[in-house]
Amino acid sequence: MHEGVQVSSKLEQLQDLLAPVVVALGYQCWGIDFSSQGKHSVLRIYIDKEGGVLVDDCAIVSRQISGVLDVEDPISTEYTLEVSSPGMERPLFTIEQFASYAGEQVKIKLRSPFEGRRNFQGLLRGVEEQDVVVQVEDHEFLLPIDMIDKANIIPTFD
């Protein structure tokens, strides 16, 4: 999904440009994801607010973000803009988000193998500095956050 430093700096640029727009509209910018599949790319912006996000909220943010993107033109290729709530399978982007969801089940995919594997599914134990602590069966892994390509909460229904 991500192609190393180039995509990482592109994400930082998009975050710096778009997060203030989302916040100014009264929403939390939960995270931004930019993925390329061949000739087509997708820019996903996850928004959140107290009480949840409705379709109308996504439309409001999408219109404002589209205007900023049209003026600033930070993406040189063709892309689709998607604005949504993080949903039940909430993606995790920051060390603070990982810390706040300690105790939840997570699915994590790394950019490159760590201890012989790229995929981890288990209990999110918390964070230690810039490492995410995940327990998979009887083994605990400290995964450097900068190695994480994608992470999501696995919803449980009690």
UniProtKB/Swiss-Prot annotation:
One of its GO terms (cellular component) is cytosol. InterPro entries: Ribosome_maturation_RimP (IPR003728), RimP_C (IPR028998), RimP_C_sf (IPR036847), RimP_N (IPR028989), RimP_N_sf (IPR035956). It is found in: Cytoplasm. The gene is rimP. HAMAP family: RimP. CDD domains: YlxS_C. Disulfide bonds: none annotated. Its main location: cytoplasm. It comes from Pseudomonas syringae pv. syringae (strain B728a). This is Ribosome maturation factor RimP. Required for maturation of 30S ribosomal subunits. Belongs to the RimP family. It comes from the Bacteria. GO terms for biological process: ribosomal small subunit assembly; translation. Gene3D superfamilies: Ribosome maturation factor RimP, C-terminal domain, RimP-like superfamily, N-terminal. Keywords: Cytoplasm, Ribosome biogenesis. Coiled coil: none annotated.
